[in-house]
From Swiss-Prot:
Record-linked InterPro entries: DYNLRB1/2 (IPR016561), Roadblock/LAMTOR2_dom (IPR004942)
Species for this entry: Homo sapiens (Human)
Descriptive protein name: Dynein light chain roadblock-type 1
Tissue expression per record: High expression in heart, liver, brain and pancreas; moderate in placenta, skeletal muscle and kidney; low in lung, prostate, testis, small intestine and colon. Isoform 1 expression is up-regulated in 64% hepatocellular carcinoma (HCC) patients.
Compartment annotation: Cytoplasm, Cytoskeleton
Length: 96
């Protein structure tokens, strides 16, 4: 667990990072550097988005899988690294 904590600290120290959320496969936040309402909102919305994106990738090619997802808007950039047991979500300011 110390390795996970160290990785989260390292990511959080990167310029522009606003928050990090680790979500289990059911969409329940396990760890977060953000406040509770924001964590819950991102976890819920990104969980369904990731499942849809993964399904789309597999529909196109059943031998393929989603390995990374990046969404950039005017205000934020959301990066997701899905794994079999959890999803790592990083929210950052793209202009910093």
């Amino acid at each position: 667990m110390a390795e996970v904590e160290e990785t989260l600290k390292r990511l959080q120290s990167q310029k522009g990072v606003q928050g990090i959320i680790v979500v289990n496969t059911e969409g329940i936040p396990i760890k977060s550097t953000m406040d509770n309402p924001t964590t819950t909102q991102y976890a819920s919305l990104m969980h369904s988005f990731i499942l849809k994106a993964r399904s789309t990738v597999r529909d196109i090619d059943p031998q393929n899988d989603l390995t990374f997802l990046r969404i950039r808007s005017k205000k934020n950039e959301i990066m997701v690294a899905p794994d079999k047991d959890y999803f790592l979500i990083v929210i950052q300011n793209p202009t910093e």
